[in-house]
Amino acid sequence: MARIAGINIPDQKHAVIALTAIYGIGKTRSQAILAEVGIAEDVKISELTEEQIDQLRDGVAKYTVEGDLRREVSMNIKRLMDLGCYRGLRHRRSLPLRGQRTKTNARTRKGPRKPIKK
């Protein structure tokens, strides 16, 4: 298994799909990295040489991925909560942020129903 950005990349998948195992790299970004490095999308990771894997590592290193990206996202959410803005308050209360209705629905965000104690 090739190891890129601290993640074991699946060997038996095509390169374009295998790179999406890294948090922060989707299919479009994966295609862009492969085009930049000059590797075909339909080549399996097991067929790549060490030199090509090193080129992939360099291509992925140009982006914010994995732990750094997770940290950045959580810091952005924490900043919104500290500011006390509307989005921060909605995060704090675990409610939908983007104007969805909450009288009905929104169960995924709110969690299971809590019974009213009498």
Swiss-Prot record:
This protein's UniProt keywords: Ribonucleoprotein, Ribosomal protein, RNA-binding, rRNA-binding, tRNA-binding
Gene that specifies this protein: rpsM
Annotated signal peptide: none
UniProt subunit comment: Part of the 30S ribosomal subunit. Forms a loose heterodimer with protein S19. Forms two bridges to the 50S subunit in the 70S ribosome.
Name under which the protein is recorded: Small ribosomal subunit protein uS13
Described purpose of this protein according to its UniProt entry: Located at the top of the head of the 30S subunit, it contacts several helices of the 16S rRNA. In the 70S ribosome it contacts the 23S rRNA (bridge B1a) and protein L5 of the 50S subunit (bridge B1b), connecting the 2 subunits; these bridges are implicated in subunit movement. Contacts the tRNAs in the A and P-sites.
PROSITE patterns given in the database record: RIBOSOMAL_S13_1, RIBOSOMAL_S13_2
Organism: Vibrio parahaemolyticus serotype O3:K6 (strain RIMD 2210633)
An individual GO BP term: translation
One Pfam family hit: Ribosomal_S13
Domain of life of the source: Bacteria
Listed Gene3D superfamilies: 1.10.8.50, 30s ribosomal protein s13, domain 2 (4.10.910.10)
Homology family: Belongs to the universal ribosomal protein uS13 family.
